[in-house]
Amino acid sequence: MGPEPASTVLTAEQEAIAVAFRRHTLLPLDDCLYALYATIPQLSRPALHRCFQRHGTSRLPLGEAGQSPPKKKCKDYPIGYLPVDLAEVQTEEGKQYLFVAIDRTSQVAFAERHPRAKRVVAAEFLRRVLDKLPYQVPTVLTDNGVQFTPQAHQFLPGGHSFDRICREYGVEHRLTKLAHSWTNGQVERMNRTIKEATVQRYHYQTTNELNGHLQAFLLAYNHAKRLKTLRGLTPHEFVCAQWQKNPTIFTRDPTHLTLGLYT
């Protein structure tokens, strides 16, 4: 038999990244796909599966007893750990930008569309999210993008506007490690979910149409989408359950709140 045919989707460097990630994490195929999608946007499930087959990593190694290794348990985060990210979308009016935030534990999600991805836009988006959430947010996680943190060559008198909002609200701003974008994979997956539910499925004549549908989708997601990770609860129901368990971390009763930025 000859050598396995080379990928027509992935470069040699991208294949090396995918295989190294698989061998290091021992994660299932779908988890690898979600984590690597931010680094390799054109990646698909079949392409990743074929890549693993070519490199002999399509099957996870067996443990000492001949069993598959136990799944690694994700680190538990208290409610209020908030990844924030930026995504590009194409519309009739040109390139637009989505700022997205999702609570890692409650899964409550917020997003806004903007024509520009400026520092002040990111900062004001964060302010609106923090004002809307009915509980304390101790930590915000972002990548090293210019919208979220100063770059090496920049001098910003008074500091970065995103960091100023964090200080104002008493929030710790953490950054993902360079070349480790999968550490912010949850919000990357939410980016993908939003795109699949909006711009990849519908044609919008104006960005106002996109805005309206985006906010309607998020309201339905927060209040009607029952999630397996929340044991069948919606994000809003989970927040209300946390209110009953630990009201001290809340700033107000969430029971009758509508979890949307413009409601």
What are the residue ranges of the model-derived segments?
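Basic, flexible linker segments flanking DNA-binding modules
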Residues: 1-17, 21-84, 146, 153, ...
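Short small-residue beta-strand/loop micro-motif enriched in glycine and branched aliphatics
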Residues: 107-112, 174-176, 200-201
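A short acidic/small-residue loop/turn micro-motif
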Residues: 115-119
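Acidic/histidine-rich, metal-coordinating catalytic segments
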Residues: 133-155, 179, 184, 231-236
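RNase H-like polynucleotidyl transferase catalytic core
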Residues: 141-142, 162-186, 202-207
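C-terminal domain-tail junction helix/linker
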Residues: 167-171, 192-263
